[in-house]
Swiss-Prot record:
Keyword terms of this UniProt record: ATP-binding, mRNA processing, Nucleotide-binding, Nucleus
Kinase found in the keyword field: no
Matches recorded under Pfam families: Clp1 (PF06807), CLP1_N (PF16573), CLP1_P (PF16575)
Protein name as catalogued: Protein CLP1 homolog
GO annotation, biological process: mRNA 3'-end processing; tRNA splicing, via endonucleolytic cleavage and ligation
Lineage: Eukaryota, Metazoa, Ecdysozoa, Arthropoda, Hexapoda
Length: 425
């Protein structure tokens, strides 16, 4: 049952409790102001007397360690105060990581590499945000690696990405997405091409771990890694691969004892595996809601948000100027493969794509590789464009791009199964 607070209402929170609310109705808007005390949203401190605005899709949990009064106005689908919160346990995880960082700083060694794992909808990206915010609040500069190609916390879906965190996330907009290191995958689940997924994770891990040596503060701050919610079968194998590629020293398992025990059995002895409860405020999302969330991230990539709008460009590219490729060829039986090649080699083969009307709405990644002779899989991407029209008569496509025409010279575009319907008005 929805609750509308047109004139607003004050909520008094005791210590170690949180105010939770959800907004599902389009065009709904909720304003929150911290009147007194101290409060935080996923590790970011709220500023007293400042109004924070939340819109459709927001699932908010404002926590206080010491007690506070919050003023809330607007239309919410759910709003309540809860004393049942795992925030103190999450703070203990931060304290343990901070001990690792202090030791690493003293010895000029690499700081902790911590993975957050668990099934879908248990709050993995939220825990990552909390741990990163707590780290920067005590002067650290950790790296954030996002391996969740389904939702994409840093880049749009279908990619893995890493970003340096230098300041706490904005309460309303999260972490700034400036200068991310992004690798193209092109599918919304690792199962779309398991061999390719492991390859891009290994490459990003290699580059990320090397980059730690370039800055002493980042080196000791370490890495927080967000992962996919696929934790059975091949999904579990991907988690083990990522833990090995990054040399994880800690794995935080959210809300699944079976996964916790499997990891205890399978990871090296020196790795700390910790079972944590999920927050009671975590909401299970339907397939439709996950799809909407992906669409919203892509829309924000091209158009920004009401607080920081972007104005993308639309221009034509002739087929002859379109150097378009896809990673992964159709599977062939071993008997049809060239001598010495295995079927899985086809999974990382770079193949040319001929433009057809089927290309419409697809996302294309702009690779830093300049030719197929380069290491295309191991090259990061500069950005993305979307095919909005295919004209077979004129032999041209229209693309939506954050940058004006033309495409950079020698640009190599990589096909993605992800689609974006550009109906922005």
């Amino acid at each position: 049952m929805s609750e509308e607070l047109s004139h607003g209402k004050d909520y008094t929170l005791e210590s170690d409790s949180e105010l939770r609310f959800e907004i599902e109705q389009k065009d709904a808007k909720v304003l929150v102001t911290l009147i007194s005390g101290f409060a935080e949203l996923f590790g970011t401190e709220l500023v007293k007397k400042k109004k924070y605005e939340f819109g459709v899709g927001a699932k908010v949990a404002i926590f206080t360690y010491q007690g506070c009064v919050l003023h809330v106005s607007g239309k919410m689908d759910v709003c309540y105060i809860s004393k049942e919160t795992p925030m103190v346990q999450y703070l203990n995880c931060h304290a343990a990581l901070e001990q690792f960082r202090t030791d690493a700083e003293d010895k000029d060694q690499r700081g902790p590499v911590a993975m957050v794992v668990g099934p879908m909808d248990v709050g993995k990206s939220t825990l990552c945000r909390i741990l990163l915010n707590y780290a920067v609040r005590v002067g650290r500069r950790p790296l954030y690696a996002d391996l969740d190609v389904g939702q994409g916390a840093i880049a749009i879906s279908g990619n893995v990405a890493t970003i340096l965190i230098e300041r706490p996330a904005s309460v309303e907009d999260g972490f700034p997405k400036t200068a991310p290191l992004v690798y193209h995958f092109g599918h919304k689940s690792p199962g779309g091409n398991s061999v390719l997924y492991n390859s891009v994770v290994s490459k990003m891990a290699e580059v990320t771990l090397q980059s730690l040596n370039s800055n002493k503060r980042t080196k000791s701050s370490g890495i927080i890694i967000n992962t996919c919610g696929w934790v059975k079968g091949s999904g579990y194998a991907h988690l083990l691969h990522a833990a090995q590629a990054y040399g994880a020293c800690a794995i935080f398992v959210l809300d699944q004892e079976r996964l916790y025990n499997e990891l205890l059995r399978d990871v090296p002895q020196g790795v700390n595996v910790v079972l944590l409860p999920k927050s009671g405020g975590v909401v299970e999302r339907s397939k439709e809601l996950r799809h909407e969330s992906r669409d919203l991230r892509m829309k924000e990539y091209f158009y920004g948000n009401p607080r920081a709008p972007f104005y993308p460009f639309s221009f034509e590219v002739k087929f002859q100027d379109l150097r378009l490729y896809k990673i992964g060829a159709p599977p062939l039986p071993d008997s049809c493969m060239p001598i010495g090649m295995k079927a899985e080699d086809n999974k990382t083969k770079v193949v040319a794509v001929t433009p057809t009307p089927a290309l419409i709405h697809h996302i294309l990644a702009l690779s830093f590789a300049e030719s197929v002779e380069d290491d295309v899989i191991g090259s990061n991407v500069a950005g993305f464009c979307c095919v909005t029209e295919v004209d077979m008569e004129r032999q041209a496509v229209m693309v939506l791009s954050p940058q004006p025409r033309p495409l950079p010279p020698n640009s190599l575009l990589l096909w993605s199964e992800l689609q974006f319907m550009d109906n922005h008005t």
